[in-house]
Amino acid sequence: YGQTELSPCVTILGQDMHREAGRRLGLHKSNGRAMIGCEVRVVDENDRELPRGKVGQILGRGPGVMKGYWNLPDETAAALRGGWMHTGDAGYMDERGYVFLQDRVKDMIVSGGENVYSIEVENAIASHPAVAQCAVVGIPHERWGEAVHAFAVCKPGSSATAEEIIAHCKEQIAGYKCPRSVSFIDALPLS
């Protein structure tokens, strides 16, 4: 796992984790463990380290971490704090130190004080047999702060109702993560 700012990466997943034993443990779905000479941690919004298994922002540091963004001191100060590169990625670390990427922090929806990661909701919606594509966003909600709203594109010759999509999601994920509303559209903007 890495990004340009972590050039080239801070975690690695060995080929042995793709074999049967690693698959049984689910480690083939991870982004690996910290590489030699690198450190990775997961923190909350106040940069406090989270317990293993809790989702937060993934931070990395090591010899390849950037020195800064060219002529962008404010962006550099926001990204590099306390010697750690704040990736903007949300994920968790398991008890063995394997990192599991979940989403982008900025895509997180906060509904009723609960963190909802868009990718988890989108995966649930996408598993509905009538759905070709989908996207979810947080929309303002008077009571909850934000509510999950879904945009769905149906497969040619298929149809679904908002109620069907919501009921399908309730079978896949926790109720507070399910969309409260669904808009059906012809296509998602792609760029």
At which residue positions do the language-model features occur?
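A short acidic, often aromatic-flanked loop/helix-cap motif at beta-alpha or helix-coil junctions
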Residues: 5-6, 188-191
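AMP-binding/adenylate-forming catalytic core of the ANL superfamily
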Residues: 62, 67-68, 78, 90-177, ...
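Conserved catalytic motifs of the protein kinase core domain
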Residues: 55, 147, 181
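Conserved AMP-binding/adenylate-forming
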Residues: 4-99, 105-108, 121-122, 131
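Extracytoplasmic/periplasmic beta-strand context in beta-sandwich domains
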Residues: 10, 180-181
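Generic structural signal for residues in well-ordered beta-strands
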Residues: 40, 134-136, 182
